[in-house]
């Protein structure tokens, strides 16, 4: 798949967004900051990525996901947990960043902060029914299948 990308921050020309390995599902996104930013415990910030994308095809969407090391080692996760980018969005990608940890974290300019994953999308056509055909699970919700 080809992805139309606008580079909005000239520094990205030297460090184009890329997949870290041939098996990586996520394209690394960088913090396009002008200076280091201290993320205090409990604080949230919108961090620019310096790029915009246009998927154009309604059969695709993009997800902004946290980098596992940032969350596990430093408590830096996404403020919205997952960022959903619709196929018709054309603005700059922003990363909602939340320091859920108990110590301040310094985010440096051009540091890899999150990753972008392209996923297929199926838009459902609603079929209104009076009842569902019975299934083994039925309406059993949280924890209804037991611990394994």
UniProtKB/Swiss-Prot annotation:
<dbReference type="InterPro" id="IPR029054">
    <property type="entry name" value="dUTPase-like"/>
</dbReference>
<feature type="binding site">
    <location>
        <position position="94"/>
    </location>
    <ligand>
        <name>substrate</name>
    </ligand>
</feature>
<comment type="function">
    <text>This enzyme is involved in nucleotide metabolism: it produces dUMP, the immediate precursor of thymidine nucleotides and it decreases the intracellular concentration of dUTP so that uracil cannot be incorporated into DNA.</text>
</comment>
<dbReference type="InterPro" id="IPR008181">
    <property type="entry name" value="dUTPase"/>
</dbReference>
<keyword id="KW-0378">Hydrolase</keyword>
<comment type="similarity">
    <text>Belongs to the dUTPase family.</text>
</comment>
<dbReference type="InterPro" id="IPR036157">
    <property type="entry name" value="dUTPase-like_sf"/>
</dbReference>
<comment type="pathway">
    <text>Pyrimidine metabolism; dUMP biosynthesis; dUMP from dCTP (dUTP route): step 2/2.</text>
</comment>
<keyword id="KW-0546">Nucleotide metabolism</keyword>
<dbReference type="Pfam" id="PF00692">
    <property type="entry name" value="dUTPase"/>
</dbReference>
<dbReference type="GO" id="GO:0000287">
    <property type="term" value="F:magnesium ion binding"/>
</dbReference>
<feature type="binding site">
    <location>
        <begin position="84"/>
        <end position="86"/>
    </location>
    <ligand>
        <name>substrate</name>
    </ligand>
</feature>
<keyword id="KW-0479">Metal-binding</keyword>
<feature type="binding site">
    <location>
        <position position="80"/>
    </location>
    <ligand>
        <name>substrate</name>
    </ligand>
</feature>
<dbReference type="GO" id="GO:0046081">
    <property type="term" value="P:dUTP catabolic process"/>
</dbReference>
<keyword id="KW-0460">Magnesium</keyword>
<dbReference type="GO" id="GO:0004170">
    <property type="term" value="F:dUTP diphosphatase activity"/>
</dbReference>
<feature type="binding site">
    <location>
        <begin position="67"/>
        <end position="69"/>
    </location>
    <ligand>
        <name>substrate</name>
    </ligand>
</feature>
<protein>
    <recommendedName>
        <fullName>Deoxyuridine 5'-triphosphate nucleotidohydrolase</fullName>
        <ecNumber>3.6.1.23</ecNumber>
    </recommendedName>
</protein>
<dbReference type="InterPro" id="IPR033704">
    <property type="entry name" value="dUTPase_trimeric"/>
</dbReference>
<dbReference type="GO" id="GO:0006226">
    <property type="term" value="P:dUMP biosynthetic process"/>
</dbReference>
């Amino acid at each position: 798949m080809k992805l139309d990308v606008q580079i909005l921050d000239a520094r990205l020309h030297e460090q184009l967004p890329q997949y870290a390995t041939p098996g990586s599902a996520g394209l690394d996104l960088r913090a396009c900051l002008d200076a280091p930013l201290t993320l205090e415990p409990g604080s949230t910030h919108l961090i620019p990525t310096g790029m915009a994308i246009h998927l154009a095809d309604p059969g695709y969407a993009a997800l902004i996901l946290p980098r596992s090391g940032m969350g596990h080692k430093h408590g830096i996760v996404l403020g919205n947990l997952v960022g959903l980018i619709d196929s018709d969005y054309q603005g700059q990608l922003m990363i909602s960043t939340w320091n859920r940890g108990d110590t301040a974290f310094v985010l440096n300019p051009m540091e890899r902060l999150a990753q972008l994953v392209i996923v297929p999308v199926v838009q459902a056509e609603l079929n209104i029914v009076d009842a569902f055909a019975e299934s083994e699970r039925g309406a059993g919700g949280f924890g209804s299948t037991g611990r394994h």
